[in-house]
Every structure is written in structure tokens, then in C-alpha cells.
Amino acid sequence: MYSVSIIGASGYSGAELTRLLLRHPGVELQELYAFSQAGKAVSELYPLLSSDKVYKPYGGECESDVYFLALPHGEALQLVPPLVKAGKTVIDLSGDFRLKSTVEHEQFYKQQKSPEAVMTYGMSELFREEIIKAKAISNPGCFATSIILGVAPLLLGNDSSINVRGINCTSTSGISGAGRSSKTELSFSEMSENIRAYKVGLHQHIPEIMQTLGTSVTTPSFDFTFTPMIGSLVRGIYSILTVNLENPAEAEQIKALYKEFYKEAPFVRVRDTMTEVRHVAHTNFCDIHIAHATANGTLIIVTAIDNLLKGAAGQAIQNMNLMLGMNEKTGLSF
């Protein structure tokens, strides 16, 4: 049995990792490291987690076999290299190691990093073999997951008649996507019965999406726009993807392409009916529905995920399972 520890365990993603790893049959949860919450019991912050473990400050320990890092952007850059050098299996949930371009990283994250600070991108539906061989994984972002899975078959599939001219994405996330820290704009009084856009055209997941789909922000091969929004739900991401094709395609043709593309992906469900956030909440599933296809080549695709699971902790454990030679569904039955 593998020993596992979490660095940054007191945030929402860290709490979900804790919950899932406590019941995972192939690992033993060893240490929970946190900075601002060090010294507090897990059950004090999260009564749902009936664990007697106490959050500890992290001081560079590397006794566990596997380390998850669920820290704010920028904080993993210095912590990951020593763990990798020590031969540990590492899965980082931040954006610190996702982008190959240091220019794009600095532009969108407002932080500098070295060109070597890149790890295998942990989206098993696209990079399964690379993940199996990897020792260090950069877990995808939540918005990026909902969008990439929603359009990947069109850009990376084997139907040569499909040529994408442009993609417009509007995605609404639950408030938990903004993290656990107290902010006035995220308070109940501000967010109840409310929805608002933010970082329009500037969100840090834009270059991640473009990179994964085989293009880039600086030299795009298709038009791409992204409007992220936050709404008055706790968890979930609901994405409406409007795709412009060079040539029209029937909805049934697109649906068949998607089902073939994801036939070996246990956590992607191509639905015949409209997706809803409540159908994926508290699960590791991504639900996709081909909602409409017009005569002028416009597709409307709708996806739904749980931002804390398929968009964070669940996908991270899915990656761990593959890296350790387990069935990727282990510990993720819902």
C-alpha cells in the first residue's frame, strides 16, 4: 500500500482530496500539511470528515510515496523540485507547471518561472500513456477541463471533414472555485441570486486550453474567446461552447464522433439529453451534450462537471491511480 500526503490540505480541493483518500483502498493517508490552519484538527474545519488527523506545517518532509499539492498559484514552484528529485510521485493542482511558454505564464499568472518548470499534463482522456509513465503531473484547471473535454473530439479526433474556425466559451462556476479565503465579493449578500462575469479574455486557463488543443495564444489556429462567470451555486461548472465549423455537420455525426473518441474514458458521458450540474455534483464525471447543429456550421455543445472533483481532486486521484498502476476508477465510485 502506498503512503500519501497532501500539502495544502485545508482548502476546498485539499478537503476533497482528504475525503477521497481516506476511503481509497490502495493508499494510506499519512500527513496533512497546511500553513494558516496548522495545529487545527481536520474535524474542526470540516466536521464531515470524521478524522483525528491534525494539520501540520510543511517543513520539506518527503517520507511519503505520493504527494498532492493543493496550494495557491506560485507556492508550489519551490516545493515540487525537491520532491521530484527525491523520486516521489507528485501531483500538483495549481497552474504553476501547466504552461510550456514562460511568456504566456508570466502574462496570465503575473509570475516568473523557469522554462524547466513544466510537468506532464494530467488529462487522462487525452494523455493516458504519458501519465502512466510520469512521476510528476500538473493537474488541469477546472474551467480548462470543462472546455477541453467539450471540444477535443472536434480538434483531436479522426474525422477529417471537421475543421474548426472558432470557439466561443461561456462557463459558469460555483463559488467554491474562488477558494476558501474570505472576500467581500464572494459573501452570501453579494452572491445570493447573482451571477457575474470576471477576467473576460484574461483568464489564466486560456493559454492552458489553447496549448492542450494544439495551438497557442500568440499564434492561434482558430478564433477563441472565453467568458468565465461565477454564480450562486457552491460547486459545479456549466459550459456552453459555440463552435464554428468550416463545413456544416449533422448533430448525429458529431455525437458519433464524441462517443467513439471517449469510448475508453470511464468518466466522460456523452448524453442524449441536456446536461445539468446536479447530475455531476459530487462525482468525477464530465457530462457532454451535443445540443444543436445549424445549417451554417455552428455547433452548440454543453458540458457539466464538479469543479472540486473532475475539475480538481477527483481528476488528481484519477491521475494517481494511473501513475501507480491501478485501475483509474479506484476510489472514485459514485
Swiss-Prot record:
GO terms for molecular function: N-acetyl-gamma-glutamyl-phosphate reductase activity; NAD binding; NADP+ binding. Keywords: Amino-acid biosynthesis, Arginine biosynthesis, Cytoplasm, NADP, Oxidoreductase. The active site is at C142. It is found in: Cytoplasm. One of its GO terms (cellular component) is cytoplasm. Its EC number is 1.2.1.38. It comes from the Bacteria. One of its GO terms (biological process) is L-arginine biosynthetic process. It catalyses: N-acetyl-L-glutamate 5-semialdehyde + phosphate + NADP(+) = N-acetyl-L-glutamyl 5-phosphate + NADPH + H(+). Belongs to the NAGSA dehydrogenase family. Type 1 subfamily. This is N-acetyl-gamma-glutamyl-phosphate reductase. It comes from Pelodictyon phaeoclathratiforme (strain DSM 5477 / BU-1). The lineage of its organism: Bacteria, Pseudomonadati, Chlorobiota, Chlorobiia, Chlorobiales. The gene is argC.
